[in-house]
């Protein structure tokens, strides 16, 4: 998703991945993804929903939003963005090897929102804070607190915006 948006607005250093599933530009949400894993018997499915603000974005009180066309001189077509996203996803998924997983993790680290900064987060309904140090090989966020290092998966954590 980050790669697709970068294709249109360029390699803006303010385009960040808010772990685990949002894309922000200038701290405003431009995209998000929802992932649902369904396991039943021998059947295993993953459903991914992706939203990218292209033509406009909702006005929200809880955080700022952005859309691709506000960064462009010439508006782009929604279908064009969809096709570019489709190609990018297909390219990542067709070679889903250890090498590809490491490349994706490296891209996440290079573009992570608040990496090497103190973050506020909620885990098990408890708000805490710590230094966002890293993302593990299993895509867990690694946070250094005053007393220890914590690894949390996306289902256990919510990063809080300032």
Where are these regions (language model features)?
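Long, positively charged amphipathic alpha-helical accessory segments at protein N-termini or as interdomain linkers
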Residues: 1-14, 25-162
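Conserved active-site carboxylates
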Residues: 22
């Amino acid at each position: 998703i980050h790669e697709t948006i970068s294709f249109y607005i360029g390699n803006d250093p303010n385009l960040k991945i808010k772990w685990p599933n949002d894309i922000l530009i200038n701290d405003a949400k431009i995209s998000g993804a929802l992932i649902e894993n369904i396991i039943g018997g021998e059947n295993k499915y993953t459903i991914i929903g992706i939203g990218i603000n292209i033509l406009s974005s909702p006005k929200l009180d809880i955080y700022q939003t952005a859309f691709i066309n506000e960064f462009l001189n010439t508006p782009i077509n929604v279908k064009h963005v969809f096709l570019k996203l489709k190609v990018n996803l297909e390219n990542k998924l067709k070679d889903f090897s250890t090498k590809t997983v490491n490349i994706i993790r490296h891209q996440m680290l290079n573009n992570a929102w608040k990496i090497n900064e103190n973050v506020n987060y909620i885990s098990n309904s408890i708000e805490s804070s710590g230094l966002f140090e890293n993302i593990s090989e299993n895509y867990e966020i690694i946070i250094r607190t005053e007393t220890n290092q914590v690894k949390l998966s996306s289902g256990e954590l919510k990063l809080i915006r300032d």
